[in-house]
Structure formats: structure tokens, C-alpha cells
Amino acid sequence: MIAVRDATGRELVLQSPPRRVVSLVPSLTETVFALGRGDVLVGVTCYCSEPKGAVERLERVGGTKNPDLDRIRALRPEVVLLSAEENRREDFAALQAAGAVFVSFPKRVCEVIQLIRALGILLDAREAAARIAAQLDETLAEIGARPFATRPRVFCPIWRNPWMGFSSDTYAGDMLAVAGAMNVLGERAERYFEVELEEIAAAAPELVLLPDEPYVFKAKDVPALAALSDTPAWRNNQVHFIDGKALSWFGSRSASGLSYLAQIVRESRR
């Protein structure tokens, strides 16, 4: 028998490891493969792009916000992997009625360690989960052992038209904090919100990070940031395009993503 708790506090009890799993969370799809259990996946979202060369064979069941529930039911999953943030409450309710669901919702990088261990229990991949969790734990320790003299003020939008940002009460926000940066929008009460560039300019960011997801920032978007042209980030050529997965994909990518962001932050202070 397998018993594991998810982010809602619910205990998921199964008689044996699931052999048919649907993942509606791209980062967890990648994590399942990293755990060596990609063979149990029977359906994923159209945004599940990793690992390349393996995920392409899987049935697509729509997007994270608009999954095809009938198609999912037809796949007869024993467990559906969800995110409290990426997926809709109504889809959770519908899928829960059809079978078992496992919900993830890490808002802190350190919480990913427990998530990975829980997935290891659920999928009967405890040893692989222990290795991945240990890697993240070691990365957190290594970064923590190198204190930051100062933390650069950073602006990291996630959308344009309208411009949107995120607070410190998010996984991405905590990734920036642990990596050594200070999110200029970190103290906002909302977790995700629209923002005016004039507000950002007033905060005088020293570093601007432009991820390639969810909005795909490219060179053509830089002129739209002209309101920031008098900020330290602009004057010191500290506007960088970054890998959005490193910032927001929690799971097996967390350790490498954190190291990647910490390096960018440190290099910005040289």
C-alpha cells in the first residue's frame, strides 16, 4: 500500500504504484521522467516539452488551463498530477470525482525537496527521488554558504500587454531571493499582478531579467522598456534574457535553475 500527502493536505492512498498517470504540470512531467518513471505517463499537456526525445510520444490532453477532461478520462489514469497554481479548481473537482489526484503547490524552493520525496513514494521511485532531493539540498547549502554582500534590485516581468510581475510569495519570487536578488515587486500583497513601468523605474532596478516563458521575451520587446532607460540596470547593461524554465519550473530542474540564476545575479555585481 502507498500513502502520501499532497499540497492540500489530503492523503492519497493506493494499493500499488500507479501504472497510468496523466500530468497537467509541465515541470512535473519532466520530474517523472527524471525519477525514471516516464513509462507510467499516458497523457500530458500541450505545454509539456521536456524531456525532449521522450515526451513527444505521449498523448496530449489540452492545456494547463483548458484540459480535455473527456480525453483524460478515456486514458483511464490511476493518478492525475496537478498544480494548485497552474490548473483550475473546477478541473481539480472534476478529475477528483473520476479518480485520484495529486496536487503540488510549492511557494518556496526548499518545499520542492518534500514534493520530490512525495513523488518518489507515489511512483515507487524513492532512491531516484532521494538523489534529486539531495542535489537540491546541496545546491541550497552551497548558495547559502556564500553570503551576498548586497542584493541587486531586480525586475523580472512575466508578461507584456499588460506588464505583469510577481511577489515574493511565489516559487519564482523565492528563486530570485535564494539566488541573491531583491525583487522590486516582492512586497506586493497580490501574488501576480499588473504593473506600470513608471513604478518600476521609480524602484531603480539594477538588474532586469526577461524570461522566455510564460511570455516569450525577445529583442523586439526591449524598446517597449524605454521607461527604464535611466535605471542602473540600463546604464550598466544589466538587461538579460533568461531561461524561463530555470525560474519557474519546480521539481527536478530546481537545482540547476537555482545555480543558473545565482550565477547571473553574482555576475551582475562584478
Task: Tell me the role of every PLM-derived stretch.
Residues 37, 56-57, 97-99, 179, ...:
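Short, structured coil segments at secondary-structure junctions
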Residues 51-58, 71, 112-116, 219-220, ...:
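Short, charged, surface-exposed secondary-structure boundary motifs
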Residues 49-50, 222-241:
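Short glycine/proline-rich, acidic loop/turn segments that cap or connect secondary-structure elements
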Residues 88-94, 207-225:
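A ligand-binding cleft/hinge motif common to bilobed small-molecule-binding domains
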Residues 2-5, 19-91, 184, 203, ...:
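A short, structured surface patch at a secondary-structure boundary
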Residues 45, 169-193, 241:
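His/Asp/Glu-enriched short active-site or ligand-binding loop at hydrolase and phosphoryl-transfer sites
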Residues 71-74, 94, 175, 199:
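Well-formed, non-transmembrane alpha-helical positions, independent of function
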Residues 1-4, 10-14, 20, 79, ...:
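Extracytoplasmic substrate-binding proteins
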